Swiss-Prot record:
This is Glycine betaine monooxygenase reductase subunit. It catalyses: glycine betaine + NADH + O2 + H(+) = N,N-dimethylglycine + formaldehyde + NAD(+) + H2O. In the N-terminal section; belongs to the FAD-binding oxidoreductase type 6 family. Residues 16-119 form the FAD-binding FR-type domain. One of its GO terms (biological process) is glycine betaine catabolic process. GO terms for molecular function: 2 iron, 2 sulfur cluster binding; metal ion binding; monooxygenase activity; oxidoreductase activity. Transmembrane segments: none annotated. Disruption phenotype: Deletion of gbcA and gbcB abrogates the ability to grow on glycine betaine as a sole carbon source. Gene3D superfamilies: 3.10.20.30, Nucleotide-binding domain of ferredoxin-NADP reductase (FNR) module, Translation factors. It comes from Pseudomonas aeruginosa (strain ATCC 15692 / DSM 22644 / CIP 104116 / JCM 14847 / LMG 12228 / 1C / PRS 101 / PAO1). SUPFAM superfamilies: 2Fe-2S ferredoxin-like (SSF54292), Ferredoxin reductase-like, C-terminal NADP-linked domain (SSF52343), Riboflavin synthase domain-like (SSF63380). The system is composed of an oxygenase subunit (GbcA) and a reductase subunit (GbcB). Its EC number is 1.14.13.251.
Length: 366
C-alpha cells in the first residue's frame, strides 16, 4: 500500500454506480451472522446516507447473481464500508458468502441507494425498532449519530430470538454506557439452557413500548425486520394513535407472496396479449452496441435489452436496488421507481431500466 493511500488530495468520492471493492475483514458477529468489510484499492470516500444499501455483483456456480444488502457501518468511517449478513438455511447467496468470501477477494458493488435513511427525515427524538438482522440499517443510523455527537435523543429497541442471536450486543452496550442520549432495550423471544437473561422476554407489545419509550408518540420511528415483525409493529402503532407519516420502514426478507402473484399475473397477461400494430410500437436504440428493437406499449427498457441479448444487471426488478441504471440520451420514459435512483441522477438523464416504459422512441447509451 502506498504512503499516500489516504491522502485527501488524491482520494475520490463514492458516486452512485458500479465500483470494484476488496474484502479487508470478516467479523463473526453471532453464530450465524458475519460482517464483511470492504475498501477500494484506489482510495474512495464511501459517503452515503445511513440506512442505504448496496447491491453485490456475484458469480455463483458460473451464473451471475445480484443481491442487495444494507450498509451496516457509518459514513463517519468513510474509507471503508461494511455489510452484515445472516446465514439463511437454504439461502443461495447468504450461504455462498459465508462459505466463500474471504479477505483479499474483490467483487463489484452497485450503489449506494435507498429512501430509508436518517438524513432525509431529521428529528430531535427517534425510536429505532429492529428485528433480527433488520438491525443493520438502524445500527448504521445509530453509529452515525454516536460518532458525530448529534444532539438526537435515541431509543434503540432490538428484538432477537435468544441472547446468542443478539447482533452487535457489546457495541450497543458500549454506546449506551458512553452517552446519555442513547437508551438501549433488547427483547429476547426465548433463552436457551444455560443462558442467563434478565431483560425483556417475548415479543414487543404496547406495555413494553410504553415502559421503554413513554413518549413514543412524539418520536420519529425507523423500523426494520422480517415481514411479520414489521406488520406487528405497524398494527401496534396504528392502533394507538401514532402519526404514521413519521413512521419509516425497510423490510428484510423474500418478496411478499402478493407481489410475486402480481408479477406472474402480468407475465401471463403479456403472453396472451394480441400482437400490437407497428404504428403503436416504440423504438428503443442502444447506441453502445448499435442494436435497436421495437417494443409494445408497457414494455420496459430492460425487457427490450433482454430481447436483443443485452445483459443489463438487475437485482430487484422493482426500482429499489438501482442496479439497472442506464443513461437515456434521447426520448421520454415513464419511470415508477421505489427509491433506487436519486433526483440528481434523473436530472442528468439516468433511468432505471427495469421500471422505465418508453413513451416514444428512446435512445439508451448501452
Amino acid at each position: 500500500m502506498s504512503s499516500n493511500f489516504l491522502n485527501p488530495v488524491t482520494t475520490q468520492t463514492w458516486a452512485n454506480g458500479r465500483h470494484l471493492v476488496r474484502c479487508v475483514k470478516v467479523i463473526q458477529e453471532t453464530w450465524d451472522v458475519r460482517t464483511f468489510c470492504f475498501m477500494a484499492d484506489q482510495p474512495i470516500l464511501f459517503f452515503f446516507k445511513p440506512g442505504q444499501f448496496v447491491t453485490l455483483e456475484l458469480e455463483i456456480d458460473g451464473e451471475p447473481v445480484m443481491r442487495s444488502y444494507t450498509i451496516s457501518s457509518s459514513p463517519s468511517v468513510p474509507y471503508s464500508f461494511s455489510i452484515t449478513i445472516k446465514r439463511v438455511p437454504g439461502g443461495r447467496v447468504s450461504n455462498w458468502l459465508h462459505d466463500n468470501l474471504k479477505e483479499g477477494q474483490e467483487l463489484p458493488v452497485h450503489g449506494p441507494v435507498g429512501l430509508f435513511n436518517a438524513i432525509d427525515f431529521p428529528a430531535d427524538k427517534v425510536l429505532f425498532l429492529s428485528g433480527g438482522v433488520g438491525i443493520t440499517p438502524v445500527m448504521s443510523m445509530a453509529r452515525w449519530f454516536f460518532d458525530t455527537n448529534a444532539n438526537v435523543d435515541m431509543v434503540f429497541v432490538h428484538s432477537a430470538r435468544s441472547p446468542k442471536d443478539i447482533i452487535y450486543h457489546r457495541e450497543l452496550e458500549h454506546m449506551a454506557s458512553r452517552i446519555d442520549n442513547f437508551s438501549l432495550h433488547i427483547i429476547c423471544e426465548r433463552h436457551g439452557l444455560g443462558e442467563a437473561w434478565a431483560g425483556y422476554r417475548g415479543y414487543l407489545n404496547l406495555r413494553m413500548l410504553e415502559l421503554i419509550a413513554p413518549d413514543f408518540l412524539e418520536r420519529e420511528i425507523f423500523c426494520c425486520g422480517p415481514t411479520p415483525y414489521m406488520s406487528a409493529v405497524k398494527h401496534l402503532l396504528q392502533g394507538h394513535g401514532y402519526d404514521m407519516s413519521r413512521y419509516h420502514e425497510e423490510a428484510f426478507g423474500p418478496t411478499p407472496p402478493e407481489v410475486r402473484a402480481d408479477v406472474r399475473e402480468l407475465a401471463a397477461e403479456a403472453a396472451e396479449a394480441p400482437e400490437v400494430p407497428v404504428a403503436d410500437q416504440h423504438q428503443v436504440e442502444f447506441t453502445a452496441t448499435g442494436k435497436s428493437i421495437r417494443v409494445s406499449p408497457g414494455e420496459t427498457v430492460h425487457a427490450a435489452a433482454a430481447k436483443l441479448g443485452l445483459h443489463i444487471p438487475k437485482a430487484c426488478g422493482m426500482g429499489i436496488c438501482g442496479t439497472c441504471k442506464v443513461m437515456k440520451t434521447a426520448g421520454e420514459v415513464e419511470m415508477e421507481h421505489n427509491g433506487g435512483i436519486t433526483d440528481e441522477d434523473v436530472a442528468e438523464g439516468y433511468i432505471l431500466s427495469c421500471c422505465s416504459v418508453p413513451k416514444g422512441d428512446v435512445v439508451i447509451d448501452y
